[in-house]
Amino acid sequence: MIIAAYLVLINLCGFWVMGIDKRKAQQHKWRISEDRLWLIAIVFGALGVWLGMQTFRHKTKHASFKYGVPLLLVIEAILIAIYYSPFDL
């Protein structure tokens, strides 16, 4: 239950941060560092970051985000599936 709540919160955070960074880019204001965006994605927020990328059309031309976030999302999905698997792997 706690893990599921964490996953929801970190992915909401990832989505929100991508929206904020896009808006700040349009306004030519301070930006959220790519390192911070990657950190959120790496700590199981890749789904939220990816959804934010698609929704806000942000970082979609950066190869590291374009290919890295979906790859990280697949890895995270596999790890979560293994964790919640009823089988002893």
From Swiss-Prot:
The chain crosses the membrane at residues 5-25, 36-56, 67-87. It is a multi-pass membrane protein. One of its GO terms (cellular component) is plasma membrane. The keyword Membrane applies. The keyword Zinc does not apply. Pfam families: DUF1294. It is found in: Cell membrane. Its main location: membrane. Keywords: Cell membrane, Membrane, Transmembrane, Transmembrane helix. InterPro entries: DUF1294. This is Uncharacterized protein YsdA.
